């Protein structure tokens, strides 16, 4: 018979919890640390794992060693995922920063991803406002505001009207 979770060592419970977390999607190291240290809902309400800092470090090291936790892979997949959803480089950088990814790692991955951000900005504008894109000033401002919110840079937005003039 399996022993109750309260009697299992904290390290084993942390390892199980980390496996469940990483089975859903890739996470950054900082995200995994945050989720592991947060209380988990049990049958009788929130339960905390009484683990030591060493237990957390051992779990993180185990996942790095077995290549289940890799910030570089996470960043590349995150950029691909968010860009497919129509978000621009500024927003993606901000989200990666919130997930604890260093600026250097983010910039390296952004250079390697080879995404044409001005073309993506145009696709988003056409999807939202239709073809041809508006040419009067007030409508252009609406398009710019929408694309800035989505995380595109002003240079990429201005390229839409320079490169793709109707």
Swiss-Prot record:
A cellular-component GO term for this protein: cytoplasm
Keyword Cytoplasm set for record: yes
Coiled coil: none
Pfam families given in the database record: RecX_HTH1 (PF21982), RecX_HTH2 (PF02631), RecX_HTH3 (PF21981)
S-S bridge residues: none
Subcellular location: Cytoplasm
Keywords: Cytoplasm
Family to which this protein belongs: Belongs to the RecX family.
Record-given protein name: Regulatory protein RecX
Biological source species: Salmonella paratyphi A (strain AKU_12601)
Source species taxonomy: Bacteria, Pseudomonadati, Pseudomonadota, Gammaproteobacteria, Enterobacterales
């Amino acid at each position: 018979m399996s022993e109750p979770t309260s009697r299992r060592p904290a390290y084993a419970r942390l390892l199980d919890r980390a496996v469940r977390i990483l089975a859903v999607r890739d996470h950054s190291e900082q995200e995994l640390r945050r989720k592991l240290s947060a209380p988990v809902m049990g049958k009788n309400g929130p339960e905390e794992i009484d683990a030591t800092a060493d237990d957390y470090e051992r779990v993180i090291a185990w996942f790095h060693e077995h290549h289940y936790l890799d910030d570089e892979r996470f960043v590349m997949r995150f950029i691909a995922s968010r860009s497919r959803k129509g978000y621009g480089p500024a927003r993606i950088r901000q989200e990666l920063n919130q997930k604890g990814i260093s600026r250097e790692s983010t910039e390296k991955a952004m250079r390697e991803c080879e995404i044409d951000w001005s073309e993506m900005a145009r696709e988003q504008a056409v999807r939202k406002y239709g073809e041809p894109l508006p040419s009067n000033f007030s409508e252009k401002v609406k398009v710019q505001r929408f694309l800035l919110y989505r995380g595109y840079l002003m240079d990429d937005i201005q390229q839409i009207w320079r490169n793709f003039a109707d």
